[in-house]
């Protein structure tokens, strides 16, 4: 069972994926997590910024674990598409990727300085996902330079499809990206890896 601190981090990640970081207040996290009111600054002396950073790290680790568990690039693509497909359907298209939600807010002049550590964490998560994905593609026999290009392409395209699916309240963008990335990977894989 998770303690109050862990529940707060998970709750923050869940709220960010639906509302974004700016609209996720500590009071909302406390209510969502069921943590005691005075616990926020006890567990997060760095305040809301620390909580948001840890929520980004948590969400990043969740997807990184999926990437590491995948047998290969095609299985990884299928697993990620399925994860976001189920997430979008189960939340009536309210929940996207919390890392993307934080990143979209990077240009906000009002909070740029305060949000800088959170944005830096989000950038590091995207880089890590791309690196781990490239390693999957390399293990499948795709040359390293091409594997890194495909990993950035896959990450970027998937994030865009999630955003479009949310806005349109329709899975078509996700399905299209799934089909096209799958075809691209199949064309790139050596015969023995297909």
Curated annotation (Swiss-Prot):
Gene Ontology molecular function, alphabetical: DNA binding
DNA-binding region per UniProt: 25-44
Keywords: DNA-binding, Transcription, Transcription regulation
Superkingdom field: Bacteria
Keyword DNA-binding in annotation: yes
Electron transport recorded as keyword: no
Every HTH tetR-type domain range: 2-62
Note: Was identified as a high-confidence drug target.
Protein name: Uncharacterized HTH-type transcriptional regulator Rv0196
